[in-house]
């Protein structure tokens, strides 16, 4: 029941409460265990595992638990012919698990992408609209309850990585593999990146992407430049948005609140009704016996256009040296702007590259950093032009 209900005298008298969490996993009067504790270790893991072993259905909103132990727990659920449902674990009020696991199952999904963390989207929206620094916006988000007191999992991209890793497993019939997911958060983005992005016709979003091409998988979470006119640039504040590409319908777009008591509670109740109606699905889409171990590509092997921001001395010949370092790796420049830097006698050189392999870009950046005229700060952000209309 909602936490406010536990403080009600009538509720306390009419509902059996216990401080012995593990007893729920073995209690013969319990048919369905709902776990909303959180975390991948400790009591949450122990009680869910024990409940499944004792042939009890489990509903959870714990994406960290499933991203770390999803293969093991799914196998136990399958062996005991019980449900392990987790609609509330991904994108709050958006029924994305049901859509991917059931409704679009036969449509040959080839890509899932979007905004899966409301805290980051709220912060990036405020930075874009108000030209504020990251730390100031984070403090404001914490005061308003949009960010946790310890926001590490959110702002470092870990929460979004948990979610896209699970969706990838369901969509592409592969085991859950969080370690193979590339993760980069939003902490290095500052207000000037938004200023430059806007001038170039872009905004910045934390995107989660999972895709399958032939027998290769991509799983990644990182900030991206997206076109200002695109639909995804307009997804603001704590709202989540997910696109599922398939070979039958094409783009299936889902948008809604990513967290909160109402959306989370609605998803939990949806899972509960499925169990009561006798609806059973393999937790990760198919039997664990049918999961295929496909190669998950490293980010270094992928190719993107890039935004490069280089702080360098404002003197003749510097741009020629930077261009030479890029051309050695056959990296061509689409556009360039130069702005005064906060530092005296320095300039901010902003480049947009054509599509290039990330390993090549990183090699060029190393060479650029060694130039005596360049400060140690060379920033790059990947550009996603093709994902969203």
Region spans (language model):
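Rossmann-like NAD(P)H-binding beta-loop-alpha module
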Residues: 78-159, 166
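Catalytic, metal-anchored helix/loop core of enzyme active sites in primary metabolism
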Residues: 110-113, 121-124, 140, 145-150, ...
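Single conserved hydrophobic/aromatic residue that forms the stacking wall/gate
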Residues: 1-6, 10
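Rossmann-fold NAD(P) dinucleotide-binding segment
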Residues: 19-61
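A conserved regulatory-domain signal marking ACT and ACT-like small-molecule sensing domains
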Residues: 267, 272-389
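Rossmann-fold NAD(P)-binding glycine/threonine-rich loop
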Residues: 42-53, 63-92, 97-101
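General beta-strand structural signal in soluble alpha/beta enzymes
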Residues: 18-19, 34-35, 58-61, 84-88, ...
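Substrate-binding/catalytic subdomain of NAD(P)-dependent oxidoreductase enzymes
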Residues: 136-234, 239-241, 260
């Amino acid at each position: 029941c909602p936490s406010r209900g536990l403080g009600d005298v009538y509720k306390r008298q009419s509902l059996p409460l216990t401080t012995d969490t593990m007893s729920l996993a073995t209690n013969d009067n319990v048919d369905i265990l709902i776990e909303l504790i959180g975390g991948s270790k400790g009591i949450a893991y122990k009680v869910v595992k024990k409940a499944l072993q004792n042939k009890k259905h489990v509903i959870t909103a714990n994406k960290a638990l499933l991203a770390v132990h999803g293969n093991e727990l799914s196998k136990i659920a399958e062996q005991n012919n019980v449900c392990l449902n987790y609609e509330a674990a991904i994108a709050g009020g958006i029924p994305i698990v049901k859509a991917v696991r059931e409704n679009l199952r036969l449509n040959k999904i080839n890509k899932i992408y979007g905004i899966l963390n409301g805290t980051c989207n709220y912060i990036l929206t405020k930075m874009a609209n108000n030209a504020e620094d990251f730390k100031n916006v984070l403090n404001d988000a914490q005061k308003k309850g949009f960010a946790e007191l310890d926001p590490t999992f959110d702002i470092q991209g870990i929460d979004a990585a948990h979610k896209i890793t699970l969706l990838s497993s369901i969509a592409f019939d592969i085991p859950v593999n969080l370690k193979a997911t590339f993760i980069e958060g939003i902490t290095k983005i500052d207000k000037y990146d938004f200023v430059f992005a806007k001038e170039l016709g872009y905004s910045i979003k934390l995107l989660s992407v999972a895709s399958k091409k032939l027998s290769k998988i991509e799983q990644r979470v990182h900030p991206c430049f997206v076109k200002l006119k695109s639909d995804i640039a307009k997804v603001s504040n704590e709202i989540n948005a997910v696109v599922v590409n398939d070979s039958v319908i094409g783009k299936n777009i889902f948008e809604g609140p990513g967290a909160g008591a109402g959306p989370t509670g609605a998803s939990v109740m949806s899972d509960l009704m499925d169990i009561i109606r006798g609806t059973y699905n393999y937790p990760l889409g198919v039997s664990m016996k049918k999961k295929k171990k496909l190669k998950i590509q490293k980010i270094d092997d992928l190719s993107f256009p890039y935004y490069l921001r280089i702080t360098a001395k404002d003197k003749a010949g510097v741009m020629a040296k930077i261009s030479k370092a890029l051309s050695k790796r056959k990296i061509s420049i689409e556009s360039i702007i130069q702005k005064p830097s906060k530092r005296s006698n320095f300039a901010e050189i902003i480049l947009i590259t054509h599509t290039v392999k990330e390993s090549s870009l990183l090699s060029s950046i190393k060479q650029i950093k060694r130039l005596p005229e360049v400060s140690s700060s060379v920033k790059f952000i990947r550009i996603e032009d093709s994902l969203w209309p």
